[in-house]
Amino acid sequence: MTRFFCCGSYFPGYPSYGTNFHRTFRATPLNCVVPLGSPLGYGCNGYSSLGYGFGGSSFSNLGCGYGGSFYRPWGSGSGFGYSTY
C-alpha cells in the first residue's frame, strides 16, 4: 500500500469520499503524499495542488487502476472524486 499515492485503495475506510471528496474524503492518508517520483506520480501529483488526492482534472491521467479497482471520476469534469467501491 505504499505505491497507492491517491491512486490506491488505501481509502477502503473512506469510500464515501467519492461524493463529498472535498469534505468527506478528509481521510487523505499520508500515503497520498508519497513522492511524485513514483511511476503513477505523473497523474497523482496533481493531488498535492488540490489537496484532495486525485490529481485534479487529470483523473483520466492518474488512471493508476485505483488500487486495482476501477476509478470512476465522480466529478466528470472536476477530476477529483473517484470511487474505490
From Swiss-Prot:
Keywords linked to the UniProt accession: Keratin, Repeat
Location of the region described as 12 X 2 AA repeats of G-[YCGS] in the Swiss-Prot/TrEMBL record: 37-82
Superkingdom to which the source organism belongs: Eukaryota
Tissue: Wool.
A GO cellular component entry from the record: intermediate filament
PANTHER family assigned: KERATIN-ASSOCIATED PROTEIN 7-1
SUBUNIT field: Interacts with wool keratins.
Family label: Belongs to the KRTAP type 7 family.
Described purpose of this protein according to its UniProt entry: In the wool cortex, wool keratin intermediate filaments are embedded in an interfilamentous matrix, consisting of hair keratin-associated proteins (KRTAP), which are essential for the formation of a rigid and resistant wool shaft through their extensive disulfide bond cross-linking with abundant cysteine residues of wool keratins. The matrix proteins include the high-sulfur and high-glycine-tyrosine keratins.
Protein name, entry field: Keratin-associated protein 7-1
Organism, scientific name: Ovis aries (Sheep)
